[in-house]
Design a protein with these regions (language model features):
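N-terminal beta1-alpha1-beta2 module of alpha/beta enzyme domains
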Residues: 1-88
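An alpha-helical appendage that flanks or caps ligand/catalytic pockets
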Residues: 2, 8-13, 19, 143-177, ...
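Internal, glycine-rich beta/alpha segment that forms the wall or movable "lid"
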Residues: 3-15, 19, 29, 100-207, ...
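Conserved, mostly hydrophobic/aromatic
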Residues: 17, 54, 62, 80, ...
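Hydrophobic faces of well-ordered beta-strands that scaffold small-molecule active sites
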Residues: 17-21, 58-60, 89-91, 119-123, ...
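Active-site mouth loops of central-metabolism enzymes
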Residues: 25-40, 94-102, 184-194, 291-300
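Short, acidic/polar
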Residues: 37-49, 193-200, 302-309
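Structural motif
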Residues: 53, 114, 205, 313-314
Length: 354
């Protein structure tokens, strides 16, 4: 029996194909690192390009590290909203645990107003935890912070006076939270990295699930897709299409893509890995991840074929390609966006239709 999440399998045009960035600080063509301010403006320029090329959605992630210039995605999305007309604008993710749900809702409702109803939010617990000490939160409260704040956010989505009480923020009594969205709804996803408990929580709240598949064979996430679908069926909550986000890079040839991406990717991965106890990344591991794992790197045809195979295997309804990694050249990033919009997206749809 078909499932509501499977509608794109019969209609590839329903598949949402997007781009994702953390606002990595790039280099110019002479190899000079841009300032944070210039890096943020570069994200806006790339979003404008993507909008004109028919990319469905642009997601901007929140981080609080020197490698990434964007700490408040919704502020960048608001700027993008005023220069674009059709592309959907999403966070990827917003770290709800170290933020206030009321303020998050208000900020994204404002982006929704500026964009004419194109705003989406992906809520996450935070795989990078720099925001917790920065904003005065205890990592020991990691679970309860997200659980309670997500519960409040779901109530805010009903867009009526809210009464709520928990342990992580002051209570609300018939609170009016403004602005309201024109449509009466705000598309909301929960970012999931591979925890069954996170999958069940997302299903219980009736929200869409966005899988962060950043390493290893993507097929290993099939049980989480199945669990989400079974849970929504059993709980009677809305059955949303499942989304996924994976890193990758598009260039004119496979060799160019692999060589351009390798050094910036290795540098940022090793910098983070050193803090988490990971060994340095070897070139053989990088190549293996491209061939059999979750790096979508190569020419438009190579990337499109791998994306289509993953979409077909997992049955996802949205695929966001994280196309920035460390200090890539600005010109290479612009070319990647161009190739993704003009070649990869049409190829993926054709492959799935066939």
């Amino acid at each position: 029996m078909s499932h509501p999440n499977d509608s794109h399998r019969n209609d590839p045009s329903a598949l949402v194909l997007g781009l994702d960035t953390f606002g990595d600080v790039p280099v110019d063509d002479s190899g000079v690192l841009l300032t944070d301010a210039a890096a943020i403006r570069q994200v806006v320029d790339e979003a404008v390009l993507a909008d004109g090329l028919g990319v469905d959605v642009l997601a901007v992630g929140e981080h609080h590290r020197p490698e990434w210039a964007v700490s408040t995605p919704e502020t960048v999305l608001a700027g993008i909203a005023t220069r674009t007309s059709r592309i959907r604008l999403s966070s990827g993710v917003t770290v709800l645990s170290s933020d206030d749900p009321v303020r998050v809702f208000q900020r994204f409702a404002t982006v929704d107003a500026l964009s004419g109803g194109r705003a989406e939010v992906i809520l996450g617990r935070g795989s990078s935890t720099e925001s917790f000490p920065l904003f005065g939160f205890d990592l020991a409260d990691y679970e309860v912070l997200f659980e309670e704040k997500l519960d409040l956010f779901v109530r805010l989505l009903q867009e009526r006076p809210v009464t709520w009480e928990g342990t992580v923020r002051p209570p609300l009594r018939d609170a009016q939270v403004l602005p309201r969205t024109e449509s009466g709804r705000l598309t909301t996803w929960v970012g999931v990295g591979g925890s069954p408990q996170s999958v069940l929580r997302t299903a219980r709240h009736g929200l869409a699930m966005m899988l962060a598949i950043i390493g290893g064979p993507p097929e290993r996430f099939a049980p989480y897709v199945d669990l989400y679908r079974r849970a929504t069926d059993q709980l009677g909550t809305p059955a949303h299409p499942v989304g996924m986000h994976s890193p990758g890079f598009v260039a004119d040839t496979d060799e160019e893509a692999r060589e351009t991406y390798w050094r910036p990717y290795r540098e940022i991965r090793d910098r983070i890995g050193a803090q988490r106890g990971w060994p340095p990344l070897r070139r053989a591991e990088y190549e293996a991840e491209i061939e059999r794992g979750s790096l979508y790197i190569g020419s438009p045809e190579t990337v499109a074929r791998k994306m289509a195979a993953t979409v077909r295997s997992l049955g996802v309804g949205r695929f966001d390609l994280l196309y920035t990694a460390g200090a890539l050249p600005v010109s290479a990033r612009l070319r990647a966006v161009e190739l993704y919009g003009t070649k990869v997206i049409p190829m993926v749809r054709d492959l799935l239709a066939g």
